[in-house]
Amino acid sequence: MAVPRRKTSPSRRGMRRSADALKKPTYVEDKDSGELRRPHHLDLKTGMYKGRQVLKVKKED
């Protein structure tokens, strides 16, 4: 059975666990509509991505 040769220090253990924390999602303000959206994602309200219409928008009644 594999056994660690040395005890893991608290610093090394903490550095390993630092990647486990949940990260806050980032949002950017859309230049055209002013809505908040995720970076590199299309704007669902307008259907635009990088200045092009990529999604047909449903009309709200």
Curated annotation (Swiss-Prot):
Keyword Ribonucleoprotein on entry: yes
Biased composition, class Basic residues, residue ranges: 1-16
GO terms (BP aspect): translation
Q: Name one Pfam family in it.
A: Ribosomal_L32p
> What cellular-component terms does GO give this entry?
large ribosomal subunit
Q: Which keywords does the record carry?
A: Ribonucleoprotein, Ribosomal protein
Which GO terms label this protein's molecular function in UniProt?
Answer: structural constituent of ribosome
Task: Please give the residue ranges the record annotates as the region Disordered.
Answer: 1-61
Q: Compositionally biased, Basic and acidic residues: which spans?
A: 17-44
**Family of this protein:** Belongs to the bacterial ribosomal protein bL32 family.
Q: Which HAMAP family match?
A: Ribosomal_bL32 (MF_00340)
- What is the protein's name according to its record? Large ribosomal subunit protein bL32
Q: What is the lineage of its organism?
A: Bacteria, Pseudomonadati, Pseudomonadota, Alphaproteobacteria, Hyphomicrobiales
Write the gene name.
Answer: rpmF
